[in-house]
Amino acid sequence: MKRILVCLSLLAMIMSCSTRQQTPARVGYDLSSAAASGDIPGLNQKTDLDRMQRGVDQCAALWRPEDGTQADFEAFVKRWLATSPADREVLFGKLSRAMEIFATQANQLTIELGRPTVLAEGEPGDIDYLFSSHDSYAHFSDDMFENKVAFITILNFPHYTLEEKNSLGGGWDRLQWAYARMGDRFTERVPASVSQAVTVARSAAEGYVDVYNIKMGHLLTEEGEKFFPEDMSLLSHWNLRDELKSDYADVPHAREKQEMIYKVMERIVTQEIPAAVVNNPEYDWAPFSNRVWKDGKEVSLPSEGDVRYGHILNQFHTFQELDRWCPAMPTAIARNFEGSIEMTDKEVEDLFVRFLTSDQVKKVGGMIGQRLGRELRPYDIWYDGFKSRSVIPEDKLTAETRKRYPDAEAFHRDMPRQLRNLGFAADEAQFLADHIVVEGARGSGHAWECVGRTEPARLRTRIGEGGMDYKGYNIAVHEFGHNVEQVTDLYHIDHYTLAGVPNTATTEAMAFLFQVRDLQLLGYGRQTMDADATLDIFWNMYEIMGVSLVDMYTWRWLYAHPDATASGLRDAVLSIAREVWNKYYEPVLGTHDSPLLAIYSHMLDYPMYLPNYPIGHIIHYQLEEHLAKCGSDAAFATELQRIYRQGRLTPQAWMKGAVGSPISIDPILAAVEKIIYNR
């Protein structure tokens, strides 16, 4: 999970929130009259008055009484309006430099203060969690409005809506796009205390998620058998899911282990799991009967209750406060989709539902049932048999990854070779590796973005005492994909405001490009898009779209029930998960009323992040289809870098520049239909 992009997206949403509680000063300035009278030197009817007036009007909308009088406002406009293209470009360069400095310093503070809680460097104390929840950017927006830098930015680089960017952007050059993205920096205003409260709630949820380990060696069947290694500890949901997926290979007790993990997941989402068994090796737990033993004696333990859902509710309450300051996008839903993803939630929902109800889903489900030789079960949403690695026993892969990567430094040393295996030139492979730091993670691992051209990207990965197991390696390769994109579209970009990609879904697509080539990076030969690879992406879309709908519908429910309790939210989420399951999954996988779709931990600490994954899968497939035309690994790497260097356009503009067509599920539906027809 690309946490830093989420944090920066949150910053953008916070910086684009305004007040309803303070009446704006009634100020304004007619530039047409000023041009006619000569009040502003260099301003005349031939200059870009419409764009300039737009900036003036947007400044006026955010000007408060404490910012000054009408006379002060007019003086401000006369002093700071860049009336010539040359002056405007110089100002843009200076603002860009300052923004990069601010972002870099804030990022470094966040990294260092968060080290004890996110890295595997000893047990963090309560004080560490307090420091990690500190938002070093919380006062940035306030400060920039107070010293008028925000107003200067708005005046000269006004904001354009998503619709305007998509309609006008086709005629913009790179500098105009960069100006437009500068216009996204300050659109409204929010108190620092509100943004800090959002950070604190999220940090608390992260702390809960990051230590939610299930001690697999202490899980019992009803007959008292143990199927997992004594020291196996799996983080929910990531490692539980990946262990379940690994059991599609020919390993002892594979089916029994899958059923047990599924039951554990059910107990977690229903909150029937005994609270004391989480991250605790002192108890043996039989998840099917929910009985617990300590030192061979059965004990009675209270369930977790509604703690899981309390974290969602806490974040909702902080977003409610944020809503009051955001009249343009007055809900977290609007800010997430229109503001961050740059697609409306209805647009995303329609895309997902169209996919979930396609004939191809049932046909591929039937294909999986034939391969498995049994009726499908709910956990078959994670069927892993379309990957070549699924026929290689995981213990063999784990033995290899542990030998190669006993620690984080070993993985880092091997990065240039991995990149060369993908076709990157030796010098570029070394450059990228030199700008990525690898660190041991406390949680599942993540990629932490470099936001300034004086710092590295950071790959946080989970490495056990015996070295990196295959699950950890696969996740690390995903995060490595994030890092390569992060370094490339920052260090090789033409304008700082265009650094990055359009949204989180796009960077997830870039990470998927690496993750599906994990064996190629390991040395198993070139991996290309074949029928199984297409089916694998298709089935991944099917799984994560349902999970995403549960997340989206949960937040719609919260806004419809703003006074909900944690227990009420728990019941609602379970109901939503079952309804989505019954409508889109039961016809394919069977089992009425399964709550499995509520298992993803993202719902707790990164609300509405999940839709980025299926959108990312859609983008990923379109990229794979495009990159398949490359005749060699070197051509693949060259084209990939060209796509990276487009930077942060809107999603549709970026996609058209990447592959020549907008974001669409049609290519993969057509490809899957062709595969089914030919089998």
Residue ranges, per PLM feature:
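Sec-dependent signal peptide recognition
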Residues: 2-8
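C-terminal, non-catalytic "cap/extension" segments appended to globular domains
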Residues: 22-292, 297, 319, 323-392, ...
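Auxiliary, metal-adjacent structural segments of Zn-dependent hydrolase domains
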Residues: 393-455
